[in-house]
Amino acid sequence: MDGDSSSSSGGSGPAPGPGPEGEQRPEGEPLAPDGGSPDSTQTKAVPPEASPERSCSLHSCPLEDPSSSSGPPPTTSTLQPVGPSSPLAPAHFTYPRALQEYQGGSSLPGLGDRAALCSHGSSLSPSPAPSQRDGTWKPPAVQHHVVSVRQERAFQMPKSYSQLIAEWPVAVLMLCLAVIFLCTLAGLLGARLPDFSKPLLGFEPRDTDIGSKLVVWRALQALTGPRKLLFLSPDLELNSSSSHNTLRPAPRGSAQESAVRPRRMVEPLEDRRQENFFCGPPEKSYAKLVFMSTSSGSLWNLHAIHSMCRMEQDQIRSHTSFGALCQRTAANQCCPSWSLGNYLAVLSNRSSCLDTTQADAARTLALLRTCALYYHSGALVPSCLGPGQNKSPRCAQVPTKCSQSSAIYQLLHFLLDRDFLSPQTTDYQVPSLKYSLLFLPTPKGASLMDIYLDRLATPWGLADNYTSVTGMDLGLKQELLRHFLVQDTVYPLLALVAIFFGMALYLRSLFLTLMVLLGVLGSLLVAFFLYQVAFRMAYFPFVNLAALLLLSSVCANHTLIFFDLWRLSKSQLPSGGLAQRVGRTMHHFGYLLLVSGLTTSAAFYASYLSRLPAVRCLALFMGTAVLVHLALTLVWLPASAVLHERYLARGCARRARGRWEGSAPRRLLLALHRRLRGLRRAAAGTSRLLFQRLLPCGVIKFRYIWICWFAALAAGGAYIAGVSPRLRLPTLPPPGGQVFRPSHPFERFDAEYRQLFLFEQLPQGEGGHMPVVLVWGVLPVDTGDPLDPRSNSSLVRDPAFSASGPEAQRWLLALCHRARNQSFFDTLQEGWPTLCFVETLQRWMESPSCARLGPDLCCGHSDFPWAPQFFLHCLKMMALEQGPDGTQDLGLRFDAHGSLAALVLQFQTNFRNSPDYNQTQLFYNEVSHWLAAELGMAPPGLRRGWFTSRLELYSLQHSLSTEPAVVLGLALALAFATLLLGTWNVPLSLFSVAAVAGTVLLTVGLLVLLEWQLNTAEALFLSASVGLSVDFTVNYCISYHLCPHPDRLSRVAFSLRQTSCATAVGAAALFAAGVLMLPATVLLYRKLGIILMMVKCVSCGFASFFFQSLCCFFGPEKNCGQILWPCAHLPWDAGTGDPGGEKAGRPRPGSVGGMPGSCSEQYELQPLARRRSPSFDTSTATSKLSHRPSVLSEDLQLHDGPCCSRPPPAPASPRELLLDHQAVFSQCPALQTSSPYKQAGPSPKTRARQDSQGEEAEPLPASPEAPAHSPKAKAADPPDGFCSSASTLEGLSVSDETCLSTSEPSARVPDSVGVSPDDLDDTGQPVLERGQLNGKRDTLWLALRETVYDPSLPASHHSSLSWKGRGGPGDGSPVVLPNSQPDLPDVWLRRPSTHTSGYSS
């Protein structure tokens, strides 16, 4: 932040500055008047020895001659204007350093100097010199101390993003809240509110070939009938007068009564007793309960039979609402249930099931043994029951005692499991009845909800000592799902609490946690607005609510990383302003957030490739939410952090100090607070030990093991998921799919018990065979919205359809004959198939029934083919004769004008209706190939036919078996493309995608081992797994990419130390959130919790160990694999170009010679000596090819005493090799030592020499690094973090402390460079010279200081506490000694008295 003094017209009194502390100018310091523009006068910089004062075109501040050592320190200084050719930023004013700093005195100079800034109100230069933008270092023309001067104004427009956030955080937050509020209001008012009444909608494939045909077929069925678009009969008056009673199903029992009542006078007594006892036969539409023995024994014993009767009476019939729901007899009493005990009472002539005896059970078992053989052989069928005369010949072999009553057939067909008395167990002496079904005399549906919740929902009410209810089919699945979706909402809320509670513990701030939660909710609300209004999506499925947890998991990772970087910038810039911290933090975090957000959203958007509408809607909503969160986080998080830092952090600390003063209870609380603080410190120490030392050391040292282990896990997961046993496909169509946990009675009935009873195995009226429906006249085009399952399709007529021509008649007749010759044609189908309607027409025309409607031309006319009009006329007459009520389907569809609009021809195949995907696929492929061949020979009017069947389950299975692999592959490809665009590094992108792919493969393999079915919920979350597993890997990838070190091991350690702690905390919080969702009843919540647990934990492992181990082996070094662009300057690029080039920082050919009045010397830097600690062998990871200390070792000690006892030489010249502090703190942000063991060139000129005393190296030529903007300039103009590959974080190092000799404390190297006018070339730029240490390196004393202007201090302290007073032994800021060797990095030194850990270690 700028804390500058304001200008005043008079110089008598100090003017208050706009700084945060209200700095004032010291008394007695004169203010010079404005002298004019900077371009009015140009002066040459004169060395301090030549002139005691420097003139300025703006000011003239006399500087006292520093040669008089006895006088007081100078109180005035001369402001020096910055010319347009100066490499310094022109937006800053400079003042020269005291002259005595150029002398080699024995004491530290400048300790008592006070420099006053001359106020100034003129305009600034427009732009900096271009030489400062090329990423190279050039010494400045004049020695300057950089400060920022800001005019005093009531309002000043922010010049940068960081300044906007730092100075106006409340305004930024309010603006974001206003945008969120407006978008929420527009989203709620501009579209329909979401309707979750049918939460299972959207899980049927749509917009596929099979799905479109099914949708059109359902629409054709819905639009066919009386008073509809199409008619089965061409008579208009008949269709218009037909009432809805024609389509209304007959009342229960009416069909049976109409067929039975005329025969009741001759029926036996047993049959009349059964009809009087039960209210007809059991039906599928009744509610059902499944009983099993508690002791795993047989249910065919008297105790179990009586137990079932009592449980029904106590739990169901005693409920108050049962009487209003049950079917009633003629006596207005509730009908008895169809249970094993009641059938036993009927066959034994008992009044109730509780009156039956053991003898009755034994007698009935013997009768069942006899009749079971005929039932399983197919002889005992409903048509054989009763004493009627019109029975099929095969009924004659059935004994009368088995067929005279329907009780035996109903017991075997409806109530007893298929294994009881099956052909394999008929000879058992004591057959075992494992399961028995009970039919309640109430229809299935929502009316049973109260009975279920009051009596059947609790498990302890469904069991006694003999039997228990383990399965139910009450028709309540949809209704109960809506109930539990609301009731189980507590589990996702607990998961959210776990995520944000872990975040609060990590951030140690409730305010920040609430702001993050508010940011997540705001992102979702804005995404809802875009989803509803911008994208105009009509359907908002219930699964979109899962985006709250998914986005919270992504946000948790970003938040932890951000505040780690925020704390790090605070520790590295303790005196820097908030604008500096925001700029430095967002330089790294903005890059990471951009790459992570784009990669995650691209992975979610890839799921749009799915054909399930619910999955596509979630992909669109979740991808949009991630992008909105990306945009919002760029301003929301830093503004929240600034707000907390400015108004809450310091105020809370002050209130906390004053709150503990008081009585004994408060002292007790203080003791507790101290204990908790001690625990927190212990946890922090453990965290530093684990993530700063052990984890990097373990990853690098055992990288061989990690690569092999995780590669084997990924390969095993791929084998399990793709080869054996694989993910099982669903066995039920979407409406009956699994929605509750597997142990729920509803799910157990559908998954286990439904197939155990023979009446459920075969669909009614169709014999269990797959039908084939051939359609002509309607195109298979789904005109509905593929993203809205509620939208219905309309029928698209085929304009070329014609079935009345002679060629069409011949082809249709031949199609019937050829179909009968196919192997899949069922020859035992009942009645004539409508496929052969031409044969049916021929037989009708030759039959006597043709004349029922009166004399007609059709009767007796056998000339084939007929004329088109005659053919259509006879078809209409046949339809009227055989279906006078308009309900019999002959395969003909007429429109309102009586014309033939469509043909719907059906026949039955010998393929069984099975949930087996392979068998259904064989049926579909065989029929498709046959029909394609037939249509190829069809006349033009019949070539656009198509077929469908009972393929709802197959359509879902086909989509789930093919789409997840495609979606995951596309998601990985998009992730790779996004990472490549973000890093421009091919190896890093490949390694990241490999880690993400390994995460997905291992996760799917684990889900297979958990016996997951690849159902709709699983497909939903598998499509999101790539998006969930990206962020941890991106954390490490970006941190590795932004690391300033060129060697891969240092970069691996750097990235692990920087992000591993936040990554582990985020994974632990999400694991806890997943565990809290496991008790939920709704399967969606449970599986979302499992996915969160598995994906995040597996992703953390693959990112931390597999990805980093790959980088240890094959990670890019320097520019390896980097797609270079003109604006991308890597931190290790300086000085590595062509040696003969005119690159900044390289010595020019004529600059070595001395200039007039100067005695230039050359210095050369040697690698700094390092000393191993005793724990080196156990605490570092070393290379087998060298004995250099590991980059992970922090045990190398920094010495305050002399490293060498060689006497120090006196400086040869006042102008020594100096360092510009801008180059120090911008080019290489991390602490690093120059290593003689690693050189970039293919033929290094120097080699390390090792002996038993330590490590030495040959001298290396040095070259200064390129300068950049100073920290002050960064606050006003943030660096472009997307063009620069170097991180702005300073002090993040994996190397160890180094030391130079401290034998000569007076031989210091100044911070900035002063250049005489003779050293300037023709263009006014300084001429660079190569420096040499002349073999005196061991006696060089490095006392470099950081040049920072602290606006938080009063102006009177600036001269003593700015660049002079700061940077002492206690200052933790690092210093840099540039290396003249272009292939080697600079020498970075840590302050002597600090030994930091964590990121700065």
Swiss-Prot record:
One of its GO terms (biological process) is smoothened signaling pathway. Residues 1175-1184, 1284-1305 have a biased composition (Polar residues). Keywords: Glycoprotein, Membrane, Methylation, Transmembrane, Transmembrane helix. The chain crosses the membrane at residues 170-190, 484-504, 510-530, 542-562, 589-609, 617-637, 704-724, 964-984, 990-1010, 1019-1039, 1064-1084, 1088-1108. It is found in: Membrane. Its main location: membrane. Residues 1259-1270, 1352-1362 have a biased composition (Low complexity). Residues 1-91, 113-138, 241-264, 1169-1192, 1229-1337, 1352-1401 are annotated as: Disordered. The modification Omega-N-methylarginine is found at R1366. Signal peptide: none annotated. Glycans are attached at N239, N349, N465. It comes from the Eukaryota. PROSITE patterns: SSD (PS50156). It is a multi-pass membrane protein. InterPro entries: Dispatched_Hh_regulator (IPR052081), SSD (IPR000731). PANTHER family: PROTEIN DISPATCHED HOMOLOG 2, PROTEIN DISPATCHED-RELATED. Belongs to the dispatched family. This is Protein dispatched homolog 2. It comes from Homo sapiens. The gene is DISP2.
